[in-house]
């Protein structure tokens, strides 16, 4: 991977810069495509995996046609793109169209600072953690706008639920990341991973000393993405599809894409903040040099990150198939009366662990 960056990406970057302002613009467009295209393709296969896994849990087959079910999601996208986008006559026309774009843009923009390996990151920003908090907070504005612009009581009720839920759990997520920042001494995502490197393998990860914050961040991530059992925003039995009830065709597909892109993003972030990112769980236990195709098992690399992400992404599906939906008041009580006090207490505990040397990589 490093050879690819050195021999292909860097010369290509310099060539674009040599074209002047137009080259800079083209390079920016290329970087946007490098984010958007892999995310869209990953979401498509993730949807197929979700339908297959839930099918197996329900003792069904799941998708079986369109390439044995593998390309079912692509067929669904093709169908949605050619459906008519209907707008309620009483809706606010401009805001109705802007809302799904405003939801999708932050979901894509957040990926620009996510490191896949020590050298594989689009923008190795020194304030990556703060940037992520900002981007993940912006998506709710599109949801609120969709509920208001639809001029529907069901859509507006779903939007208000989403606003309250996201604000509530955003606080808990932010406090959980304060603990990560104290333990690592950095807000750079790559440096947070390096702070978990050591000769003890997974014992050096933040999962063990910050376990309560890990649970809070994981559950809050599920609530932030409005997934089961926290899916009161679009509870089918109560408010049909919530803020998306008046949307159809490509506009509905954009909301759908943003939701699943955020689910995969949260899976990446949990792996980076608490499970050592691309680090191997047995790093430092084996020092043999066999071949580059085998060494990653104990030295770490992007395959380890993808395996961790796959586990958390599959857990989203397991939650959906297993747990009943919480009531709205139960969700609010969990966020405000349990998670926020717990994170505040554990921030103090983390500071003490850093001060007394229990966590060696802190400030």
From Swiss-Prot:
Pfam families (alphabetical): NADHdh
Location within or outside the cell: Cell inner membrane
GO cellular component term, pick one: respiratory chain complex I
Catalytic reaction list: a quinone + NADH + 5 H(+)(in) = a quinol + NAD(+) + 4 H(+)(out)
Enzyme class: translocase
EC number(s) per entry: 7.1.1.-
Keyword entries, A-Z: Cell inner membrane, Cell membrane, Membrane, NAD, Quinone, Translocase, Transmembrane, Transmembrane helix, Ubiquinone
Database matches in InterPro entries: NADH_UbQ_OxRdtase_su1/FPO, NADH_UbQ_OxRdtase_su1_CS
Membrane topology: Multi-pass membrane protein
Molecular functions (GO terms): oxidoreductase activity, acting on NAD(P)H, quinone or similar compound as acceptor; quinone binding
Oligomer and partners: NDH-1 is composed of 14 different subunits. Subunits NuoA, H, J, K, L, M, N constitute the membrane sector of the complex.
HAMAP family given in the database record: NDH1_NuoH
Biological role stated in the UniProt entry: NDH-1 shuttles electrons from NADH, via FMN and iron-sulfur (Fe-S) centers, to quinones in the respiratory chain. The immediate electron acceptor for the enzyme in this species is believed to be ubiquinone. Couples the redox reaction to proton translocation (for every two electrons transferred, four hydrogen ions are translocated across the cytoplasmic membrane), and thus conserves the redox energy in a proton gradient. This subunit may bind ubiquinone.
NCBIfam families the UniProt entry points to: PRK06076.1-2 (NF004741), PRK06076.1-3 (NF004742)
Protein name (database record): NADH-quinone oxidoreductase subunit H
Gene expressing this chain: nuoH
């Amino acid at each position: 991977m490093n050879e690819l960056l050195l021999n292909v990406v860097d010369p290509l970057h310099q060539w674009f810069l040599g074209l002047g302002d137009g080259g800079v613009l083209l390079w920016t467009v290329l970087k946007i495509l490098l984010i958007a295209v892999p995310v869209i393709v990953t979401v498509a296969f993730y949807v197929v995996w979700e339908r297959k896994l839930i099918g197996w849990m329900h003792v069904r087959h799941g998708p079986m046609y369109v390439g044995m079910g593998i390309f079912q999601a692509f067929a669904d996208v093709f169908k949605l793109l050619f459906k008519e986008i209907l707008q309620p006559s009483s809706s606010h026309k401009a805001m109705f169209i802007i809302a799904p774009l405003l939801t999708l843009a932050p979901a894509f923009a957040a990926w620009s600072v996510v490191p896949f390996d020590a050298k594989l990151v689009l923008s190795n920003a020194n304030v990556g953690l703060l940037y992520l908090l900002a981007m993940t907070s912006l998506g709710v504005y599109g949801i609120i706008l969709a509920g208001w612009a639809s001029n529907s009581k069901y859509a507006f009720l779903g939007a208000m639920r989403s606003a309250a839920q996201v604000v509530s759990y955003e606080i808990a997520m932010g406090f959980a990341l304060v603990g990560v920042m104290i333990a690592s001494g950095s807000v750079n995502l790559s440096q947070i991973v390096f702070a978990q490197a050591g000769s003890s393998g997974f014992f050096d990860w933040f999962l063990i000393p910050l376990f309560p914050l890990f649970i809070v961040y994981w559950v809050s991530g599920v609530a932030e993405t409005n997934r089961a059992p926290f899916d009161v925003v679009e509870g089918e039995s109560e408010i049909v599809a919530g803020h998306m009830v008046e949307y159809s065709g490509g506009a509905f597909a954009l909301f759908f894409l943003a939701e699943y892109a955020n689910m995969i993003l949260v899976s990446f972030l949990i792996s980076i903040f608490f499970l050592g990112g691309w680090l191997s769980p047995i790093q430092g236990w084996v020092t043999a040099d066999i071949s580059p195709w085998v060494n990653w098992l104990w030295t770490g690399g992007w395959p380890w990150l993808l395996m961790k992400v796959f586990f958390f992404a599959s857990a989203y599906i397991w939650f959906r198939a297993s747990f009943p939906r919480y009531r709205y008041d139960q969700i609010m009580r969990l966020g405000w009366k349990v998670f926020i006090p717990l994170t505040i207490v554990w921030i103090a505990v983390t500071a003490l662990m850093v001060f007394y040397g229990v966590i060696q990589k802190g400030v």
